[in-house]
Amino acid sequence: MTKPSILVMAGGTGGHIFPGLAVAEYLRICGWNVSWLGNQKGMEYRLVQSCNFPFEAVEFGGLRGKGLKAKLMLPINLARACFQSWKIMRRLKPSVVLGMGGYITFPGGLITKLLKRPLVLHESNSVAGSANLALAKIAMRTLTGFPDTMEKAEWVGNPIRQEFDNMPAPSTRYEQRQGPLSILVVGGSLGAAALNENIPAALALIPKEVRPKVIHQAGDKHLAELQARYAECDVEADIRPFI
């Protein structure tokens, strides 16, 4: 008997990728063949590879923050991405295609409809992204992580990776804990400007002798800026681009 197969499309940020990985891991346990469509230059490539899912690369990205040249090249880049997606889907013949968000899902979603494959979307954010908003018009089914995110969508919540279910209770995890309090600052995989600006200043108000240890996810683009901000506030922190 042939196993059912799914092609997961997601990229750009952890908010799209991690819920997609949760679905992919669960379906793999259930016996599905799972493949992933994404951009080899995006963070999804590293994350998906680490989970041992076959990765199908398509070259396509967003226009946010790009100049006039990128906008003029959009039709050519979209046509190329659609052709790449078409070749992938003709080869894999997935039973269903799941779009989790990010610009990379747009060309794949168009080709899914063209090849008359079932297209299911999931929007994990409270504000829907451009790709999912556009593809919702042609999707067989649209799901959301939050209520009232998209019209005519079904609110189902966000997929959670299995390792969170397997974690011991906090009372068990921290039973033997010693030393100063530690805090983790996470503003999403791309960082968050408001947190990057205000957290160092807030921590500076706490006396050094009782100040907690800080691990702060800055986002790749804001790493140097955040390091300078902590130095300006005379606060020691473990600053990382992505955790």
Identify what each model region corresponds to:
Residues H16-L27:
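Short amphipathic alpha-helix
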Residues N33, M43, P54, K113-P170:
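Active-site-proximal region of nucleotide-activated glycan assembly enzymes
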Residues V34-N39, L143-G145, P212-G219:
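Short internal beta-strands
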Residues G42-R46, P94-L115:
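An aromatic- and histidine-rich active-site surface loop
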